[in-house]
Amino acid sequence: MMKQCARRQMTEPVFRVAVLLALCSLSIGVDVHQAQKTPSISSAALQRHKRDWKWDKLYAYEETRPKNPPEKIGKLENTFFSSSTRYILKGDGAKDKFGVTDNGDIVVLAKLDRETQSVYNLSASLLNIHTGELVDKDESFVIVVLDINDNIPVFDSDQSGSISESSRAGTTIMKVKATDADDSSTENGRIDFKLLNGTDLFKIKPNGDLIALKSDLDREKQSQYLIAVQAKDMPEHLTGNSATTVVTINIKDINDNIATFKKERYQFTVKEDLKPGSEIGLLEVEDKDEIQNKDPTFALQSKFNDVFDIKRTKEKDGMLSLKVPLDYEKEKTHKFIVIVEEHTVSRTPDNKGLLKRTEVIIDVTDVDEPPIFNQTEYTFSVFEGPFKNPVIGAVSAKDPDSASYKIRYTIEDANCPVDVDPVNGYLSLKRTLDREQESLYTFQVTAHEDVLNGLKSSTMVSLKVLDINDNAPELTNGSYVYVCENDKPNTIIGTIGASDKDENSGRFRFTLARKSSNFSLYDNQDNTATIVLKQGGFSTENSEEYVLEIEIADGGTPEQKSVNLLQIKVCTCQSGRRVEYCMSYARTGMSVSALLAILLCIITILVIVILIVLRRRYQKEVLVTKASGEIHEQLVRYDEEGGGEMDTNGYDVSILSSACHDSSFRPSVGPALYAMVKKPPACKGDMAMMIEVKKDEADRDRDGIPYDTLHIYGYEGTESLAGSLSSLDSSSSGSNLDYDFIHEWGPRFRTLAQLYGVDGSDSDSSY
């Protein structure tokens, strides 16, 4: 049987530690008890009783350095223990922190830390050293680590609190928190708090509650307190560990101060053209409370409430603004009193009796202002149609400045139907208005000072065109009137209506302008009329066209009438007058507008023809009356041997030059187209003969230039609007021109001199 002994070290207060140590030293042998189970021998058999293990907790102090030999804390005993067996420990800290000797003593091998691990669970077993088998089964036990005061108190990271100013005495501000890693069930882990300063305003309870002692905390005097707090373990003992921290106490603001003005007088300068709604200046106020607790209100003297306004800014100051325009000519200075009040103060204000009123002075400066109309907008109305008096109204503006310049009025829109008198502003119509085309005109009238670089302003004018009964009614729904072949007399074949472009037209009256033998019309007295068939027997094979002349009167003042033609078709219908086929009529008539267009085209064509004839006559007269010196001749001659590249690209030279060999291509001899000119006197041969010879040579020479390159313009006829291009008046006789100076030009111009020389002969030749 196994016995066990253990050193018992119970957790007691510190002042009993010495007694326990003495008792433990004496109990090494005394506390060791043996639990032997002696077997009883009977005659029948030898029986073994069941073993009963009884284990107590084993105790060991933390932070004890290992000793040599190791410190013994208990002993294992077993009846099966012998020299061939040994004890083995298993579990937490076995072999590194705890061990067992050969005789069963449990020893501490390393320094223990209760804050790391306070309880170790182990088991003991007895092993046969030869076979390696267990002699007895394992039994468990516990080793408890005893605490010593080896840790100091630790404060939480956030040690701050707040209290509203003027709070009652005894109000809890916050709870100071600190922890000690030592055993809290002993004096080692219990903490006591103490204030090191500020004891006249605050106190702290043992549990850490921080309490205010006074009710006159004022944030405006001091908004924050820094209090040193000490935390110490081992209460009621001089010894022990302690720590110190600083606790921040913030005084929260309440609205216990009223807003007051910083100055007794505020003065601003404002131009008279400042627009309403604009800011004038800031009325600064002073309030020691925080901005969220400021709640000032501003009040002006009653007669200035319509001119000025004060609004509170984000900073809780007063912003003075303008409500209506100022006028320097009426009042140059404005003086008034502004009062600031605060009705949400939580208690009697600390700053009562300070400045709550201030005087505001506003000096208005003069500026050159544009003309001002006596109305912001003008509205006039006029009846459409012809008018007797063109004046529809007037606009008026004046110069508000002391200079009081004259005002002139203009309308810049050229399409405006209204004109304005530049001096007195009378508005008059420029043309007749038609409400059906446009019922409302809106335009701008400008007034400007009658000086150089004068200012100007504008106003909007609306002209409403009133209606008169000037439009005749028109027929509607006429396309839905038809007669069926199988219609019987007194059948309603359709209903017509009327419309009028005028406003508020009265009831329309319908009558037949010309009686009809086939149809009748009944006025329904509701702006409609019914067409009724008098007799039947209509057929689509009959080409006769049926037209009703219907007179419609609108009943207005003056009454307008119109005669409308209603064409009635003859149709083949199914049951219920459902149209299957309608006979169409060829319309031979023509509208008045088409006739006018055709007539206008005819007149235009006649005018163009007359102008062309007159111009041609004028050209003929000018051509006949030209002087002989104004007609010149241009002689184009080619000296080179054949035409150039540009001449030969456009035609076939062989075809042109072969004209003399084919008599069919020779031009027929016709009447002379050129006027007769004088034969040059200096020429010794007949000019006509010489030209014929040259022409014949050119026709026979295939390598030469075409025969038609010799251009002689004598007279181009009378049909050209540009007149004659001739450089010589070939038809004139008795020329007085002298060409003897050509002989002086040299031998190159000898032939030309011969052509235009004078030989005394007056005979003429034609060419």
From Swiss-Prot:
Keywords of the record, alphabetical order, are: Angiogenesis, Calcium, Cell adhesion, Cell junction, Cell membrane, Cleavage on pair of basic residues, Glycoprotein, Membrane, Metal-binding, Repeat, Signal, Transmembrane, Transmembrane helix
The record's note on what follows loss of this gene reads: Disorganization of segmental arteries with supernumerary filopodial extensions that show multiple contacts between neighboring segmental arteries at 28 hpf. Failure of tip cells to organize themselves into the dorsal longitudinal anastomotic vessels with about a third of segments showing dissociation from the stalk, resulting in the stalk cells remaining close to the dorsal aorta at 28 hpf. Stalk cells also show reduced dorsal movement and loss of ability to regain sprouting activity, stalk cells therefore clustered near the dorsal aorta.
| Residues annotated to bind Ca(2+) 1 | 62-63, 113, 115, 150
Give the Cadherin domain ranges.
Answer: 86-155, 155-261, 262-373, 374-475, 475-581
Residues the record marks as carrying a glycan: 121, 197, 374, 477, 518
Cytoplasmic topological domain: 615-767
Location relative to the cell: Cell membrane; Cell junction, Adherens junction
Q: Name one GO molecular function term.
A: cadherin binding
UniProt-annotated binding residues for Ca(2+) 2: 62, 115, 147-148, 150, 182
Protein name, entry field? Cadherin-5
**Organism from which the protein derives:** Danio rerio (Zebrafish)
